[in-house]
A protein has these predicted regions:
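Active-site proximal beta-strand in glycosyltransferases
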Residues: 93-95, 104-124, 150
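Membrane-proximal helix-turn-helix segments that form the acceptor-binding/catalytic region
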Residues: 128-150
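Conserved donor-binding/catalytic core segment of Leloir-type glycosyltransferases
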Residues: 150, 187-206, 212-216
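Carbohydrate-associated surface elements
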Residues: 155, 179
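Nucleotide-activated donor-binding/catalytic signature segment of Leloir-type glycosyltransferases, i.e.
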Residues: 240-256
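Aromatic "clamp/platform" in nucleotide-sugar-dependent glycosyltransferases that forms part
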Residues: 276
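A charged, aromatic-enriched C-terminal amphipathic alpha-helix characteristic of glycosyltransferases
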Residues: 314-318, 325-352
Length: 352
């Protein structure tokens, strides 16, 4: 792809709401700019004040009546607003950070399927028919996209096609694995033995209370164990109560700048990730880059080299045994697969 490109990245969230999609959008923008192209990131923050909260308001109203299809409506109204206010005929390339906000255009485009809502409802009690209705709408959404659709790992693609959507997807889905700036991980620091760390949202999908129950067993076995939790979310109050109840040596750092996250990772020894669902996991990637030994559920749809020790279930004793019993060094992995440059090049190439 020759010449200087004008690229617009559309992200259907707010800049201040951190997470994997937000990180990806910003990494893409900086990576594209570093290659000499022009890149603009459009978020809900860029909409007129009276409209920027409309997608989330519509989502809540529709979900109150017809849960969980409100997520589809949120994507639809976001797409309409972005198209009205930010569609540019002089752009060379459009990147949509979600299938729900993607529209067909004569401009070269790609839609990124980080995950689908029907696979991200762990915090809710969803009836089978409700889930089926949402899946059907998502399948129709994907089939209506005329430009390439990519997802973030081979494992997640296999899960979506053969399991989640039960081979009902007719569209070809490509894979572009995510990448991050690895510069700050090159610094080596002395790791504190028995120091465990977790980074991510404190929400149902991340299974944070299970992590605390596992840590309680570890601490009762060896009082040298320490746990640092980086992140925030709706499960924080429950986590604080559990920590106080059992007087555990757990540090809750909340949301902190990314540079500080990296510094924390570099000084810990073990990364324990008790999430029940992932399609890639920046957190596991960063833990590997920082040289930590990683423990995670074997059923996650992440690159296999992200997990050093896999646990096949969510039995507390099995996690305890795995962490106590596995004293091997972290496994080596090819970090060159997960650079921003490679991610940008693959993304632009897929869109033609």
């Amino acid at each position: 792809m020759n010449g200087r490109l004008k690229v617009i990245i559309f992200y259907g969230g707010f800049k201040f709401v951190l997470g994997g999609v937000n990180s990806h959008a910003n990494a893409l923008k900086l990576g594209i700019q570093s290659m000499g192209h022009e890149a603009t990131l459009v978020t809900l923050d860029d909409l007129p004040f009276l409209l920027k909260y409309l997608p989330h308001l519509l989502e809540k109203i529709v979900n109150f009546i017809f849960f969980p299809v409100g997520y589809i409506y949120k994507g639809t109204i976001t797409k309409m607003l972005f198209k009205i206010f930010f569609a540019r005929t002089d752009a060379d390339y459009l990147i949509f950070e979600d299938i729900y906000i993607s529209w067909n255009s004569t401009i070269r485009s790609v839609a990124i399927m980080h995950a689908v809502w029907s696979d991200n409802l762990q915090a809710f009690n969803v009836a089978p028919q409700q889930l089926r209705n949402l899946k059907e709408k998502e399948i129709n959404t994907i089939h209506q996209i005329h430009h390439p659709v990519v997802t973030v790992s081979e494992q997640y693609l296999d899960f979506l096609i053969n399991n989640h959507f039960n081979r009902e997807l007719m569209s070809a889905i490509h894979v572009v694995t995510l990448g991050i700036d690895q510069t700050d991980f090159m610094v080596k620091k002395c790791k504190v033995k028995y120091a465990i760390v977790y980074t991510g949202a404190l929400e149902a999908r991340k299974n944070i209370l299970f992590l605390l129950r596992v840590f309680k067993l570890l601490y009762e076995e060896n009082s040298l164990y320490r746990l640092t939790i980086i992140g925030d979310g709706p499960e924080r109050q429950k986590a604080e109560h559990f920590i106080d109840q059992f007087k555990l040596p757990v540090t809750l750092l909340g949301r902190i700048p990314h540079q500080q996250v990296i510094q924390e990772l570099l000084t810990h020894e073990l990364y324990v990730h008790t999430s029940i669902k992932e399609s890639f996991s920046y957190a596991l990637l960063e833990a590997k880059l920082a040289g930590l030994k990683t423990f995670a559920y074997s059923g996650l749809q992440v690159p296999i080299e992200f997990i050093d020790t896999k646990i096949d279930n969510f039995d507390i004793n099995d996690w305890f045994d795995a962490i106590i019993g596995d004293q091997s060094a972290p496994k080596q992995f090819n970090s060159n697969r997960y650079t921003v440059t490679r991610m940008v090049e693959d993304t632009l190439e897929i869109g033609g």
